[in-house]
Amino acid sequence: GFMLQDRGEMFSLDPNHMNSLIGGKRPFHTIIPAFITKNNKPLVSFGLMGGAMQPQGHAQIVINLIDFKMNLQEAGDAPRIRHAGSSQPTGEKMTDGGYLSLEKGISAEEILKLEKLGHKFQYDLGGFGGYQAIMLKDNVYIGASESRKDGHASGY
């Protein structure tokens, strides 16, 4: 026997649903590896597991690498923010703007800025994803594996 992934269960049989089952359509899912290029050449391949945290985490990793000039390991270890309560492809609708979960390490100054923008907060110890990456720099591969999950980067 064999098993297949269950992401197809995200389809809806309601023809008016945003994720309705239609021939040739792919289901909404969060299996999203990421790849960064620079000058049309490979730079970083990475992934961040964690359901709805995946696209948010991917964006934060790219911002950390490109905008904040963090190295591959720092980009994964940096504190993260997760938004919850958004409308979902399964049909749930956002009604109140949701909330931000803040990982330990976000500065009080940044929290105050977010608060002034009207964000609501929740503090969580988990659910911020798990990241691994490989970067090609100067013809040398560099690996990173963040501390939130099991794993490590090694080479030979």
Describe each PLM feature range.
Residues G1-D124:
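Proteins synthesized as precursors that undergo proteolytic processing into mature forms
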Residues A108-Y156:
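In a subset of proteins, long, contiguous C-terminal domains/tails are tracked
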